[in-house]
Amino acid sequence: MAKRKNKKVDDVAIDTRGRILEAARNLLLKRSGGEVSMAEIAKEAGVSRQAVYLHFADRGSLFVALVKYVDEKRGLQEVLDTIRNAPTGIAALRAMAAAQSRTNPDVWPLARASEAIRRTDEAMEKAWQNRLQDRHSGCKAIVKRLAKEGSLREGLPVDVAADLLWTITSIRTWEDLVLERKRKRSEYEEYVSEVLLRVLTSQP
């Protein structure tokens, strides 16, 4: 009986946590990554501020959890698997540009908010740096594959190529091209893919 009761309590806690994270995500999307307070998140989730703080000690810990939550919602693992399982390194480059084009509209508001929070929150800064490093490692894996297949541009060091791939496909580049310069999603994908192939590969 006690186990059943504890399970119900756990289920309620998980449900409340999910509602809080979904509320935070929705508010960030509505405000394009603008400032969102814990009180506003509580109101959006239909819970008290106290309930929010029971699950998340502060705004930094909430946003660290939110990053993981959004990754799960957008199927990040499937996105990464598509890139890794591409038939060639060149196909992986194209898949990466396509993935950035498709997922960045949802990621950008959270990235914008996280970048502001990380400057004053140690946990958020650590999560941010880990994320950057993970993405760079993925870029380097693609470049190594290009080199192994003989597709990497002659004379281009692997480390330099990885840095270029990491930078060209960064969310900041996407922001500049799509949000600032008003390029369409299809244009971003097409032109970024072409730049990557011309800069990184020996393909004519």
Name the predicted role of every residue range.
Residues A13-A24, I41, L66-V70, R74, ...:
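Generic hydrophobic, amphipathic alpha-helix propensity
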Residues R19, L27-S61, A65:
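Helix-turn-helix
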Residues A147-V195, Q203-P204:
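Hydrophobic/aromatic-rich alpha-helical bundle segments in the mid-to-C-terminal region
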Residues R102-A113, A123-E149, D159-D163, E194-T201:
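Amphipathic alpha-helical packing segments from all-alpha helical-bundle domains
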